[in-house]
């Protein structure tokens, strides 16, 4: 896994990092004078785990949070936890025929990526695959939006998405791409075995080459007047149809 230094902000994101990955939290900054009990809990847990904690003014937190609302807390974090492409094979093998892989083809808005990761973690996915280029990466905004989910699931960054899709197929992963013009409904296909769910970016959807590497295309039926969903909403709908089938509902 590759690592990089970054700041994460927000109560849920910092609390999750302190709880789940304390070894990679370098320090925690908390707004001086705050009486928020959640911040007190974070401070106490961080100190118990040997993490440096500093009380600072709001301006200092504004400086590390940028445009992201910090909620009075920030942490300097050492790991982006991006898994290498060659680690994906082992993750699929370990799923023993029930791998559920989410492939995001060029989701560029970090808020959308964070929301997708949150849904993916809730659905218990095996891994999330993103391209290294033309895609949001796991930055502070993504961590905050994901409410800590970015720390809980493998995010695999790949150089060549088409090659990655071929490799998944060689492992017996059946790839379904989500496309509004598809004839088959999401609710008509079997999502219980080794399955990869492929969703495109906000503007253009699935790229041509990505589409060509899918084993099938499906759509979410929309009887209303709106014919499209935000990618993070579509991700949640698609993942939890897979969950429903796998639970036998």
From Swiss-Prot:
One of its GO terms (cellular component) is cytosol. S-adenosyl-L-methionine binds at residues 200, 220, 229. SMART domains: SpoU_sub_bind. Pfam families: SpoU_methylase, SpoU_sub_bind. One of its GO terms (molecular function) is RNA binding. It is found in: Cytoplasm. InterPro entries: 23S_rRNA_MeTrfase_RlmB (IPR024915), Alpha/beta_knot_MTases (IPR029028), Ribosomal_eL30-like_sf (IPR029064), rRNA_MeTrfase_TrmH (IPR004441), SpoU_MeTrfase (IPR001537), SpoU_subst-bd (IPR013123), tRNA_m1G_MTases_N (IPR029026). Belongs to the class IV-like SAM-binding methyltransferase superfamily. RNA methyltransferase TrmH family. RlmB subfamily. Keywords: Cytoplasm, Methyltransferase, rRNA processing, S-adenosyl-L-methionine, Transferase. NCBIfam families: rRNA_methyl_3. Specifically methylates the ribose of guanosine 2251 in 23S rRNA. This is 23S rRNA (guanosine-2'-O-)-methyltransferase RlmB. PANTHER family: 23S RRNA (GUANOSINE-2'-O-)-METHYLTRANSFERASE RLMB. Its EC number is 2.1.1.185. It catalyses: guanosine(2251) in 23S rRNA + S-adenosyl-L-methionine = 2'-O-methylguanosine(2251) in 23S rRNA + S-adenosyl-L-homocysteine + H(+).
């Amino acid at each position: 896994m590759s690592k990089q230094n970054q700041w994460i902000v927000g109560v849920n994101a910092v609390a999750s990092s302190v709880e789940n990955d304390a070894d990679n939290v370098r320090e925690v900054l908390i707004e001086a004078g705050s009486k928020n009990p959640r911040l007190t809990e974070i401070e106490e847990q961080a100190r118990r785990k040997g993490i440096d904690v500093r009380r600072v003014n709001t301006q200092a937190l504004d400086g590390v949070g940028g445009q992201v609302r910090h909620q009075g807390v920030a942490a300097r974090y050492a790991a982006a936890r991006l898994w290498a492409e060659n680690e994906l094979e082992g993750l699929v093998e370990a799923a023993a025929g029930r791998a559920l892989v989410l492939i995001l083809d060029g989701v560029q808005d970090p808020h959308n990526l964070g929301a997708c990761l949150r849904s993916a973690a809730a659905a218990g996915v095996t891994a999330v695959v993103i391209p290294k280029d033309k895609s949001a990466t796991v930055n502070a905004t993504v961590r905050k939006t994901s409410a800590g989910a970015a720390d809980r699931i493998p995010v695999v960054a790949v150089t060549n998405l088409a090659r990655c899709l071929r490799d998944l197929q060689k492992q017996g992963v059946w790839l379904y791409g989500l496309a509004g013009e598809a004839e088959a409904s999401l609710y008509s296909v079997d999502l219980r075995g080794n399955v990869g769910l492929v969703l495109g970016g906000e503007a253009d959807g699935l790229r041509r080459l990505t589409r060509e590497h899918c084993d099938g295309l499906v759509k979410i039926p929309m009887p209303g007047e709106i014919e499209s969903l935000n990618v993070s909403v579509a991700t949640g709908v698609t993942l939890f149809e897979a969950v429903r089938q796998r639970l036998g509902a």
